[in-house]
Amino acid sequence: MERLAARIMLLAGWRRALLAIASGAVGALALPPVGFFAALFFSFSMLVWLLDGVSGNPDRSWSRGLRSAFWIGWLFGFGYFVAGLWWLGNALMVEADEFAWALPLAVLGLPAVLAVFYGLACLAARLLWSEGLGRIAALAAMFGITEWLRSFIATGFPWNAIGYGAMPIPLMMQSAAVLGLFGVSALAVFVFAAPALLGTRRGAKLGLALAGILFCGHLGYGAYRLSLPEPDGRKVTVRLVQPNIDQAAKMDDTDRVAIFEKHLRLTAVPTPADQPRPDVIVWPETTIPFILTENPDALRQIAGALQEGQVLITGTVRSEDQGAGIAPRYYNSIYAIDSQGQILAAADKVHLVPFGEYVPWQDILSKLGITNIIDLPGGFSQGASRSLMTLPGGLKLYPLICYEVIFPDEMVKGLSGANAIINVTNDAWFGDTPGPFQHFQQARLRAVETGLPIIRAANNGISALIDGRGRVFSGLRLNAEGVENATFTLSAAPETNVNHNKCNFWAVTALLLSAAVISRLGLISRVN
């Protein structure tokens, strides 16, 4: 191992760059649908040795060493994000004649931007780099911090944070209930990078012992939490409707009536005799292909498809009149509709997809020919705030539309009082690629972090009822058409506290930074 580490440390030029990119790309194997978390042991061991090579070279100036550390981290991140996000280009091919030109921006440009965060993590870790365990702690702390920064800078995009690679199954997801995604990400980097200590032997016994304890604790806590009894409470049965409509068909005006009628047919499918009647039916995001409030006949048809006392929750487009001569505002919304055709509650999407649902700096970019992917004048408007949808029977749903479910910190706002999360989405843009699987895993982690069940309806999948520990009670696979009835228990309160998760993340970060600083100061004193 020492010989291998020495060879990697001595790499330079294109060989070093190629290994950095390849190491990041291999790490993407830990992500869904593969879920091979062990790949990250290789990736982060390689990264540490590459950084050792630019940190231990006495011929390099301080500033040059920092630049080299940044570029190694950037190349590592570029490989990781290209391998993990290449499927984003699939959305642009739905209307290839209009958006194919942007394919390089999605497949290479976005990874190049996201890789800057990993470059900064390595640069910051280089400031605290030392021999032995301290450098592993520094790298782990900086990756945790930059993953957190990635969740909100420039609207945020924490997709495929390193922590997801450490949580492929429910047994390995439960640590998120205590540490949150970013705390798990930091400790995951520590564990995955620990084998690099075998390359120099300094601090190897302690580092590997700590990594082993963390990994066993990760599994042990998972087993403990999964063994806890289910919460007591009222049972609610939901029907998930998955129409599996091709995205091109959804955008074709001539198919709108047929699409709406298909949802009505699936809603009215008889319930098997051995199952309870659904209390709530859920349709996916932007299911209704017209402004529902402007079409009373559609509301009557919905009422006709529902049985007495049932409620439909559906994704739709909401319009808001702005007065004479002013174009209306449009919102990506959720409606709750009762069996009388009355709208009981509504919620607007707050966190919009840039360049998908709106164009930032639209006045400037529109002159360059850059427009929304969605066919809507001016794009969607941002919802004012996110609030609970209160339904009959004590059901209080926290609404998340599409990729709003990927933002852990947004769970803090307005979650109090909720007894379930509703997530409607349309992943048909991404076809049969890793995208829908990655999106689904992130929804499962939000369930674990909040301790609340998630009711998830997706146009082409994956639709599922997820319990508060990330387990899938019932669902429909990707690209399947049909309905699924599932029953869950309304809990009196969430099993976890997302505010505590955030505090615990910063506590972990402080411990890692303290270890890195102590190690760094010890190295300086030895040199002096």
Swiss-Prot record:
Pathways involved: Protein modification; lipoprotein biosynthesis (N-acyl transfer)
Example of a GO MF term: N-acyltransferase activity
Membrane-traversing stretches: 8-28, 69-89, 99-119, 178-198, 203-223
Gene Ontology cellular-component annotations: plasma membrane
Keywords of this entry: Acyltransferase, Cell inner membrane, Cell membrane, Membrane, Transferase, Transmembrane, Transmembrane helix
Segments forming a coiled coil: none
GO biological process, one term: lipoprotein biosynthetic process
Membrane topology: Multi-pass membrane protein
Family from the record: Belongs to the CN hydrolase family. Apolipoprotein N-acyltransferase subfamily.
Protein name, as recorded: Apolipoprotein N-acyltransferase
UniProt organism field: Allorhizobium ampelinum (strain ATCC BAA-846 / DSM 112012 / S4)
